[in-house]
Amino acid sequence: MIIKNLNQKIITIDNSSPYQKFIRIYRWNPNLNLNPWFSIFPISTNNCGPMILDALIQIKNIQDSSLTFRRSCREGICGSCSMNIDGTNSLACLRSLNTKSNFITIYPLPHTYIIKDLVPDLSNFYAQYKLIKPWLINKIGFSLKENLQSKIDRLELDGLYECILCACCSASCPSYWWNQDKYLGPAILLQAYRWIVDSRDNSTENRLNFLNNKMRLFRCHTIMNCSKTCPKSLNPGKAIASIKYRIINN
């Protein structure tokens, strides 16, 4: 099979090779007066790293330097390389090239404004993160001694503090797609719950009062796409349900 890219380069596709992959990438450049298009790049898994991010880096270094995407740690820690890979929001550094299909299709995170190619505009996402005041609030004031937690109190934070704000869950949530100007979304609400349950924080009531809103919190309809797609295997849906429970029973 022969495919011609936007730049008129001809790519011959050999589906018979188990080591040959073809990366189909969504492209858009605000400086070009063109509709979005797809570029297809051949990759040999014999001379490429094992992850999707390795393939993207090789494509940018060797085949098309104009390809634009975010990346940093390459270890699933920073959350920079979040994108939609074969229909699932994930981190490119954690998704293997070893798939059953020879074709891998990559989009930017869905329902986000696109800066270029695979780079979403997360300005609104981080502005919402700021709204929840993601830091310890101690009305009494801090002493010169450590602010200790018991082991039981510390365990309450497990499954919450590991969130890396990659936005995979929020970008998979239909409620967030439709209402991201008002609904905080699963990632931000999970982060909010992380501070609500922290025994060292003295502003739990204020945090719950802020979230007690039909749009900020209760726009969640428990679709649970968030928990299904989280690359860190966290459960934002459970965190949101816990916030609702605390508000209703407060």
UniProtKB/Swiss-Prot annotation:
Keywords associated with the record: 2Fe-2S, 3Fe-4S, 4Fe-4S, Electron transport, Iron, Iron-sulfur, Membrane, Metal-binding, Mitochondrion, Mitochondrion inner membrane, Oxidoreductase, Transport, Tricarboxylic acid cycle
GO cellular component: mitochondrial inner membrane
Documented EC number(s): 1.3.5.1
Gene3D superfamilies according to UniProt: 3.10.20.30, Alpha-helical ferredoxin (1.10.1060.10)
Binding site for [2Fe-2S] cluster: 73, 78, 81, 93
Pathway where this protein functions: Carbohydrate metabolism; tricarboxylic acid cycle; fumarate from succinate (eukaryal route): step 1/1
Residues where a ubiquinone binds: 178
Chain sites annotated for binding [3Fe-4S] cluster: 173, 220, 226
Keyword Hydrolase attributed: no
Cofactor binding, per record: Binds 1 [2Fe-2S] cluster.
Primary localization class, coarse: mitochondrion
Cofactors demanded by this protein: [2Fe-2S] cluster; [3Fe-4S] cluster; [4Fe-4S] cluster
Binding annotation for [4Fe-4S] cluster: 163, 166, 169, 230
Localization in the cell: Mitochondrion inner membrane
GO molecular function list: 2 iron, 2 sulfur cluster binding; 3 iron, 4 sulfur cluster binding; 4 iron, 4 sulfur cluster binding; electron transfer activity; metal ion binding; succinate dehydrogenase (quinone) activity
Reaction(s) catalysed (UniProt annotation): a quinone + succinate = fumarate + a quinol
Domain 4Fe-4S ferredoxin-type: 153-183
Keyword Membrane: yes
Function: Iron-sulfur protein (IP) subunit of succinate dehydrogenase (SDH) that is involved in complex II of the mitochondrial electron transport chain and is responsible for transferring electrons from succinate to ubiquinone (coenzyme Q).
Family designation: Belongs to the succinate dehydrogenase/fumarate reductase iron-sulfur protein family.
Protein name as annotated: Succinate dehydrogenase [ubiquinone] iron-sulfur subunit
